Regions:
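N-terminal Sec-pathway targeting helices
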Residues: 45-64
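Structural recognition of the beta-strand scaffold that forms the well-ordered cores
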Residues: 106-108, 135-139, 160-163, 199-202, ...
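Short hydrophobic alpha-helical segments enriched in small aliphatic residues
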Residues: 11-14, 26-28, 33-38
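Alpha-helical scaffold elements lining the catalytic groove of polysaccharide deacetylases
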Residues: 115-120, 169-194, 207-253, 265-272
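C-terminal domain-boundary segment and adjacent tail
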Residues: 88-101, 126-135, 145, 265-315
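Active-site beta->alpha N-cap acidic-glycine motif
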Residues: 78-174, 178-192, 196-197, 292
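Hydrophobic alpha-helical membrane-insertion segments, chiefly the h-region
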Residues: 64-74
């Protein structure tokens, strides 16, 4: 037996009259799925019993290959984040804001699938287009499945769609296995409406534990929360809500703003808020444009500090 790339060659020569060669190929494109392809080549001969033995050998080889590659794959995934320090004193944190060194903000909108309010979403898209705001939409797999045409419209308008957990359980009850499964479902579902990869993951309530956060990072994704919650679900008028946002928070570079795309006042809030932020010199960017994926550290408030900014601060 010898290995070439992702393939293993196995030769069985149980008798002088027959030689059977097997090519076992493993495809690990999917992060938790292994596809094993067995191709058999045999010379002339009669020895059915020997062929059965040969097949048992290749089955065992395939099982060993699955186990071995699964270990190697997870080690490889872990290496993707080795250049980043994602914990502080053993505590993991989601990314809530970024030390950009520029006056940038990221508008994020959640689409949970609980309310089928396409009219509000379409109104929001119109406002984003008028204000020339690129945004990030965090959507559940069920919302995309139920609103496929609207999801495509979001992407065609220049926005990005990332993953939002649809789990009904609280984060303390979410297992690493359930988290991995949901990440894969989100990647596959989002992949049906856009070619842009799903690499960012959000839990609606913003509550994370170490197990979930480490699982997200290990899968090559990044947990994203927010630094400013618009509280747009409260119905006391868009103007009052924007005023409270600006009075409650002192804006910093790299703030991530949270909205609900299906909110009654969300569109109006954005139309009132953005001109004020723009006047102060802030530029709207997507989460993908703001967050760095390597060479960074985290602070206890979830602020991501790129290595370049860290050097600038202490130089």
């Amino acid at each position: 037996m010898y290995r070439s790339g992702g393939s293993f060659f196995y030769a069985s020569n149980e008798s002088n009259s027959q030689s059977v060669f097997y090519l076992v190929h493993a495809n690990t494109e999917s992060y938790n799925t292994f596809h094993i392809h067995i191709v058999k080549r045999e010379h002339r001969g009669n020895g059915c019993e020997n062929m059965k033995k040969g097949m048992w050998g290749v089955v065992i080889l395939a099982l060993v290959l699955i186990t071995g590659l699964s270990v190697f794959y997870w080690v490889d995934v872990g290496e993707k984040v080795v250049t980043a320090s994602t914990s502080v004193n053993g505590q993991e944190f989601p990314i809530c804001s970024v030390e950009t060194g520029k006056k940038q903000i990221a508008y994020t909108f959640e689409l949970s699938g609980t309310n089928q309010k396409q009219e509000q979403v379409e109104q929001l898209l119109q406002i984003l287009r008028q204000q020339e705001i690129p945004a990030t939409f965090f959507a559940t797999a069920s919302w995309i499945e139920n609103n496929r045409s609207l999801a495509i419209q979001i992407c065609q308008q220049g926005h990005e769609i990332q993953g939002l957990s649809g789990q009904e359980v609280c984060v303390e009850q979410m297992t690493a296995r359930a988290c991995r499964k949901e990440l894969q479902t989100l990647r596959e579902t989002i992949g049906t409406v856009t070619e842009e990869p799903c690499v960012f993951f959000r839990i609606p309530g913003g509550e994370y534990n170490n197990e979930v956060l480490r699982t997200v990072y290990a899968c090559g994704s990044y947990p994203v929360a927010w630094s400013i919650d618009s509280l747009d679900w409260k119905d006391y008028g868009a103007e009052n809500q924007v005023k409270q946002m600006l009075q409650t928070h002192t804006l910093r570079d790299g703030e991530i703003l949270r909205f609900h795309a299906e909110g009654e006042n969300t569109g109006e809030m954005v139309s009132l808020l953005h001109p004020q932020l723009k006047e102060e010199g802030y530029e709207a960017v997507t989460v993908s444009q703001m967050i760095v994926k390597e060479n960074y550290s985290m602070e206890t408030d979830g602020r991501q500090i790129p290595e370049s900014q860290n050097k600038a601060i202490f130089s």
